[in-house]
């Protein structure tokens, strides 16, 4: 399994880091078989798995439950788990309780937190307690209401400079990596050059140290729309609907199950069942 040290070496050597979300045993198993470097159990599960309109309703218990399943499916892959909404915007003591629960109960190797400001001290606090932390700047979905929607961040010089400052503070606080979401590629490149920790982009262009996508977006599974930054490498959704539709048709028309899908009794036992055996 790759570790923090391996990811730092990958950045130094210019080897791109691959990260993919996974939320359950089968998706994690497939991600590991595909040799993904790092798995993110994102609170995006609220939208793509649980059907919520945002990530806000996701709880600590949800993250623990799904991360445990991912750990069972990907035992040899580094796993990062999101701390959900309001689980770390509380007292440091309560933040530690939530963080400890996720790490101890789920087996996550690192936690991810969004934003800067007061979150910087949280990164420092968790790091000092021995919990690796991945920072997340740019578009931070948990704060989408404050940001005014799902918009590109850092498009003007002033806000871009603020993101650069925040990125440096995250590194100084002890973050082992930084996710940059929906920021101009020029800004992402500049931040990546100024940090020693890896940057993982999602909608941040090529000049970052790695990329992350949502599992369901990448394979077109259960999604109707995807953001501009997503490339869909396959479409399992069409095949799944086709297969289920065929199943429904065959049951309705009596084509399924066939004899080869059924079990039988010996003839004498069948006779005995119907009273034909003395």
Swiss-Prot record:
<keyword id="KW-0963">Cytoplasm</keyword>
<comment type="subunit">
    <text>Homodecamer; pentamer of dimers.</text>
</comment>
<protein>
    <recommendedName>
        <fullName>3-methyl-2-oxobutanoate hydroxymethyltransferase</fullName>
        <ecNumber>2.1.2.11</ecNumber>
    </recommendedName>
</protein>
<comment type="function">
    <text>Catalyzes the reversible reaction in which hydroxymethyl group from 5,10-methylenetetrahydrofolate is transferred onto alpha-ketoisovalerate to form ketopantoate.</text>
</comment>
<feature type="binding site">
    <location>
        <position position="82"/>
    </location>
    <ligand>
        <name>3-methyl-2-oxobutanoate</name>
    </ligand>
</feature>
<dbReference type="InterPro" id="IPR003700">
    <property type="entry name" value="Pantoate_hydroxy_MeTrfase"/>
</dbReference>
<dbReference type="GO" id="GO:0015940">
    <property type="term" value="P:pantothenate biosynthetic process"/>
</dbReference>
<dbReference type="InterPro" id="IPR040442">
    <property type="entry name" value="Pyrv_kinase-like_dom_sf"/>
</dbReference>
<feature type="active site" description="Proton acceptor">
    <location>
        <position position="181"/>
    </location>
</feature>
<keyword id="KW-0808">Transferase</keyword>
<keyword id="KW-0566">Pantothenate biosynthesis</keyword>
<dbReference type="InterPro" id="IPR015813">
    <property type="entry name" value="Pyrv/PenolPyrv_kinase-like_dom"/>
</dbReference>
<dbReference type="GO" id="GO:0000287">
    <property type="term" value="F:magnesium ion binding"/>
</dbReference>
<feature type="binding site">
    <location>
        <begin position="43"/>
        <end position="44"/>
    </location>
    <ligand>
        <name>3-methyl-2-oxobutanoate</name>
    </ligand>
</feature>
<feature type="binding site">
    <location>
        <position position="82"/>
    </location>
    <ligand>
        <name>Mg(2+)</name>
    </ligand>
</feature>
<feature type="binding site">
    <location>
        <position position="43"/>
    </location>
    <ligand>
        <name>Mg(2+)</name>
    </ligand>
</feature>
<feature type="binding site">
    <location>
        <position position="112"/>
    </location>
    <ligand>
        <name>3-methyl-2-oxobutanoate</name>
    </ligand>
</feature>
<keyword id="KW-0460">Magnesium</keyword>
<dbReference type="GO" id="GO:0005737">
    <property type="term" value="C:cytoplasm"/>
</dbReference>
<comment type="similarity">
    <text>Belongs to the PanB family.</text>
</comment>
<feature type="binding site">
    <location>
        <position position="114"/>
    </location>
    <ligand>
        <name>Mg(2+)</name>
    </ligand>
</feature>
<dbReference type="Pfam" id="PF02548">
    <property type="entry name" value="Pantoate_transf"/>
</dbReference>
<comment type="pathway">
    <text>Cofactor biosynthesis; (R)-pantothenate biosynthesis; (R)-pantoate from 3-methyl-2-oxobutanoate: step 1/2.</text>
</comment>
<dbReference type="GO" id="GO:0003864">
    <property type="term" value="F:3-methyl-2-oxobutanoate hydroxymethyltransferase activity"/>
</dbReference>
<keyword id="KW-0479">Metal-binding</keyword>
